[in-house]
Amino acid sequence: MECHRAGAEVFTGDATCRKKSVELLEELGLPKGLLPLEDIQEFGYNRDSGFIWLVQGKKVEHTFKKIMQKVSYDTKVTAFIENGKLRKITGIKTNAMMLWISINEVFVPEALPEKVTFKSSNGLSRTFDAAAFALGE
């Protein structure tokens, strides 16, 4: 993370970090409610490398109610972001059959912009309606 700090836009404070992270998700065609973090202390974005990071006060578990999917967000979430995609994600896990599985990629397929696909490091993937990840869901 430190190597991406140089030249990055860095924001602090929960309200500012939420606003900036949601704006970035929207700008790049990702659902605005994809990162429902709490007490965000820092948000950074290096436009040159595409690297983002969010630091929150404590680990958060969130259930996306429309799909009844529980997701855990660590105190530090990092990823490389590009149009319609988060890749090389750290700090996000989902609960499947009583196991926590790390998510390493999230993308919105160009051919199906109303869908969001999540991929794990072991090759498993699942696709959901993007509406399930609207802001406030």
Regions found by a protein language model. Give the residues of each.
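Extracellular/luminal recognition modules and glycoprotein regions
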Residues: 1-51, 55-65
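Helix-rich interaction surfaces within compact, conserved domain-sized segments
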Residues: 69-137
